[in-house]
């Protein structure tokens, strides 16, 4: 038997619903979603609700909570222990970031403010965050942005780096780039 995991903020994404409708009955669907009464949740054999609350403009809260739920699911599927102390610390860090309570936030805003384009670079497990951040720049800040894998950036767009070029690098703690 196969498992497909579908992640959606609204649970009504056309592409996701059409995919599920075409799946054979021997494929198990697990959904990660913010809306308990959505079509996605109804079509799924199992569902994990993020409970991120109502989104005001962009799906920032849902993205963060879906990421957390997916991480917990991956840990469970791999029979990994979940350290509740570390998990609570991470939740507090995320809460502070969402509320703008981080010492580096104002400096980052100052550096990015007025830019005409932002390049976001990530690899591995943090590439999803880079992609979502590019979307947020375009939706919320009305600033053109693009997310690229580190290797993609190194073999092409690196040539466009010049004075005033803004790039944000996402590096996970196991990455050589992190150091």
Model feature map: region roles:
Residues 7-9, 94-100, 144-147, 172-173:
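Short, flexible loop segments at the rims of nucleotide/cofactor-binding pockets, characterized by
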Residues 1-4, 115-163:
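Anionic-ligand anchoring segments at beta-strand to alpha-helix junctions in alpha/beta enzyme folds, i.e.
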Residues 1-91, 123, 158-159, 164-179:
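Glycine-rich phosphate-binding loops that contact phosphosugars or nucleotide phosphates
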Residues 80-87, 101-105, 143-144:
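Short, structured loop/turn "capping" segments at alpha-beta junctions
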Residues 16, 104-105, 153, 179:
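Amphipathic coiled-coil/heptad-repeat helices and related helical stalk/stem segments
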């Amino acid at each position: 038997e196969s498992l497909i995991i579908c992640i959606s903020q609204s649970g009504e994404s056309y592409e996701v619903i059409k995919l599920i409708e075409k799946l054979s009955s021997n494929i198990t669907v697990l959904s990660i979603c913010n809306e308990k009464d959505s079509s996605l949740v109804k079509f799924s054999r199992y569902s994990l609700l993020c409970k991120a609350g109502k989104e005001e403009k962009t799906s920032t809260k849902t993205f963060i909570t879906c990421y957390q739920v997916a991480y917990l699911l991956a840990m469970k599927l791999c029979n990994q222990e979940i350290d509740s102390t570390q998990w609570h610390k991470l939740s507090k860090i995320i809460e502070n970031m969402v509320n703008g309570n981080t010492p580096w936030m104002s400096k980052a805003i100052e550096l990015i403010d007025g830019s005409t384009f932002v390049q976001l670079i990530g690899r591995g497990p943090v590439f999803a965050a880079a992609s979502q951040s590019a979307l947020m720049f375009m939706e919320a800040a009305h600033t053109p942005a693009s997310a690229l894998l580190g290797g993609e950036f190194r073999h092409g767009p690196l040539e466009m780096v010049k004075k005033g070029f803004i790039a944000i690098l996402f590096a996970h703690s196991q990455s050589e780039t992190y150091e």
